[in-house]
UniProtKB/Swiss-Prot annotation:
Organism: Tropheryma whipplei (strain TW08/27) (Whipple's bacillus)
Cellular compartment(s): Cytoplasm
HAMAP family: GlmS (MF_00164)
Gene3D superfamilies to which the protein is assigned, alphabetical: Glucose-6-phosphate isomerase like protein, domain 1, Glutamine Phosphoribosylpyrophosphate, subunit 1, domain 1
SUPFAM superfamilies xref list: N-terminal nucleophile aminohydrolases (Ntn hydrolases), SIS domain
Gene name, Swiss-Prot/TrEMBL: glmS
Lineage: Bacteria, Bacillati, Actinomycetota, Actinomycetes, Micrococcales
GO CC, alphabetical: cytosol
Domain annotation SIS: ranges: 289-428, 461-606
Catalytic activity: D-fructose 6-phosphate + L-glutamine = D-glucosamine 6-phosphate + L-glutamate
Name used for this protein in its record: Glutamine--fructose-6-phosphate aminotransferase [isomerizing]
Pfam families named in the record: GATase_6, SIS
Amino acid sequence: MCGIIGYSGPRPAAEVLLKGLERLEYRGYDSAGIAVVTDKAYIESVKKSGKLNVLKTCLERRTTPIVGSTGIGHTRWATHGEPSDRNAHPHMDTEQSLAIVHNGIIENSDVLKRELLASGKSFTSETDTEVVAHLLSDAFKKTQDLVQAFVEVTQRLEGAFAVVAIHKDQPNTIVAAKNNSPLLLGFGQGENFLASDIAAFAEYTQRVANIDQERIVALSGDSVYITDFAGHPVDYEVHTVSWHPASVDSSGWSSFMLKEIFEEPQAVENTLKGRTEDGTVILPECDHIRDDLLAIDRVVLVGCGTAAYAAMTASYSIEAWAGLPVSVELSHEFRYREPVLNSKTLAVFISQSGETMDSLMAVRYARQAGVKTISVCNVMDSSIPKESHAVIYTKAGPEVAVASTKSFVCQIVVLYLLALYLGQLRGFRSIFPRQKAVCELNRLPVKLKQVLEIYESVRQLAHWMSDSRSILFLGRHAGYPIALEAALKLKELAYIHAEGFAAGELKHGPIALIEPGQPVFVIVPSPVGSPILHAKVISNIREIKSRGARIIAIAAEGDSAVLPHADSVLRIPLTRYSFEPLLSIVPLQIFALELAADKGFDVDRPRNLAKSVTVE
């Protein structure tokens, strides 16, 4: 489910493939491998379970290097079969004539495997990928052409997949098939690339072409040819992207995640740039659906994990600033519960990668129901934006750490902009004047920088609490989803029990978890912006403090009411309470990172997690 790289050109393929796999490590993986058509026209493949360094060491210990200029590589995240050498990619046919790598899931692999076993084929792995290797091998024997073999085999495959293959009898050619799984082309001088992510070949070229769904691609060092699944030639468009390899370099930082947290002020500034003017919001991305937006009577926000919590956070402001009812849905549940949708519904889909399979399927479901769709994504020209009526890009820049930080903050900012934009269109007059909201929104980059000044205090707190086995997070209003996100970050990175609760729910059950010494982070709304909410949260703090909880408060500067009740206070700048979540999450992100680092865990690549979840 993770990373693919293919290369054909004059360079040593093994070196290019390994560099590409290094750039794809951030997506998460449990094994890695490469296959190269050698100068002697046979395929040599090496694959190992574990980190990429294990594969590198294996290659370095070889008495003879792998020599060849066309090859494929893969980082695997197990979906069929345990992480092991035999289940790692690439997979080969019985004759060792063909090698393939594959992302996605072949949903009818069990049926196909039974057919192949009945025909006398044997299998060396537990994967669905090996099924495709045998099918392609048989088809090639009939057609003697790898493209035609793919045309035949893709008719039999069900599910979402990107399959990339090389064959010893077509030594300078790579052929791939794409169906609902990320894959794009890179064009160099006398060399071409194929990858699931531009990061894999960014140091060689920024000229790319996105491959549409249900396409077969054949490439060599000097040519690219694309057909549909029926074998009919189709056109493609090459464009240049702005991507510098330094953007995926963590030099000078202990981790990509820490680097990305400190990039949040600039990321928010970039996301806001050109989108506000004189107290109004400008979203030209939505101008072509303006009339449709005027007709909507409700909004549905859809996402998974961190993106869902960004949606929850912003839902309060959309209702307050646009006067529209809002519901928040998990992408993987959305299309299975028969939601009531119509042409007056606006569905907004949030995904950092733009490739989250659950969200992509939800977009298609919504469009079939006649719903207007907007996507909020970070990766340009990814699948979800292509299938949405409109897209508003976050401009967070590349995010390498698996756990999202700056993308989360920028997603909320974009949803705030959308809330204000919808309010403008509808002429809705909220309690908080729109011009003031826009002004305060533009102050956020400076205030985020101020929050980062407490980094050392948060780091020390994490060190003191590194032996904690369970940590709770409480919040009210838009602070509640921030509590959920903070708990998720701690689970993702530090592998300890963490739960987020709405503070008002304490007395309805969760207070039973409170015992002497129990750490509880409480997100305290400012008394200036919301004195009623503030008083309620202080009451909640007193309630759990009386039962021995250790209280760590996230509170605005000048809020003295928390001091008698909190064991520690982490201060954030004063802002309108609608914007407090954007500031409150930052110390909580740092805390999760530093606590995990103190335990010796890899904060950039947590176990079992993938950056882009491209299977259902």
